């Protein structure tokens, strides 16, 4: 089998590091880009170069932006008393897509993990405590993933914020809309039973 030239192989290897792309998918993507250089590859390379120099973290919340403050933090119509804490920007974007939250966000940049040696100082937890003190936050909503590390992080944050007196809530967990009980794991069913409400 013929090997691709070294620079193309390097591009394939780099593409394969992206989530959802394995070596075969990366190879197909690179071949498509090479086939459509003018329409796909050149504009993609230019956009990536621009984003590499302009993208940065919002100094207030940690969202990705190309200014000091992101559009959400600059939006004066957002509720200033509600702060939704998320693990990463992808979670923030998912909540924004849903359109159900009109407050502000705080992106941690990960979760606590003894296995990966990630402690509170590696995350934006100290900055979260500062924001609660300085911005007059009345409610912190913990929208962290229902993993062991996510729940450990949620409990840690609740303990850190307890002296401030701020109300700390978390997202409900349970049966997804359209979900069938037979297909759900025991933990999800248990969480749904514990979070039940009057019908």
From Swiss-Prot:
Question: Where in the chain are the C4-type zinc fingers?
Answer: 58-73
Q: Which GO terms describe its molecular function?
A: DNA binding; zinc ion binding
Keyword tags:
DNA damage, DNA recombination, DNA repair, Metal-binding, Zinc, Zinc-finger
Q: Boundaries of each Toprim domain copy?
A: 81-176
| Gene Ontology biological-process annotations | DNA recombination; DNA repair
The entry sums up its family as follows: Belongs to the RecR family.
This chain's function reads: May play a role in DNA repair. It seems to be involved in an RecBC-independent recombinational process of DNA repair. It may act with RecF and RecO.
Q: Name it.
A: Recombination protein RecR
Species of origin: Cereibacter sphaeroides (strain ATCC 17023 / DSM 158 / JCM 6121 / CCUG 31486 / LMG 2827 / NBRC 12203 / NCIMB 8253 / ATH 2.4.1.)
């Amino acid at each position: 089998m013929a090997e691709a030239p070294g620079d193309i192989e390097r591009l394939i290897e780099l593409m394969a590091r992206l989530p959802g792309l394995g070596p075969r998918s990366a190879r197909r993507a690179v071949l498509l880009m090479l086939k459509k250089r003018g329409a796909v590859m050149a504009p993609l390379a230019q956009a990536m170069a621009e984003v590499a120099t302009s993208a940065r973290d919002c100094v207030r919340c940690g969202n990705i932006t190309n200014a000091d403050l992101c559009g959400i933090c600059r939006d004066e119509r957002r509720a200033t008393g509600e702060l939704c804490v998320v693990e990463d920007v992808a979670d923030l974007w998912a909540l924004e897509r849903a359109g159900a939250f009109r407050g502000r966000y705080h992106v941690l940049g990960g979760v606590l993990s003894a296995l990966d040696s990630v402690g509170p100082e590696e995350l934006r937890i100290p900055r979260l405590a500062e924001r609660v003190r300085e911005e007059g936050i009345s409610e912190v909503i913990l929208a962290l993933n229902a993993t062991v590390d996510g729940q450990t992080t949620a409990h840690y944050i609740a303990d850190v914020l307890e002296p401030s007196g701020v109300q700390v809530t978390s997202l409900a967990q349970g049966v997804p809309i359209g979900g069938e009980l037979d297909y759900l794991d025991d933990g999800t069913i248990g969480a749904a039973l514990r979070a039940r409400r009057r019908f």
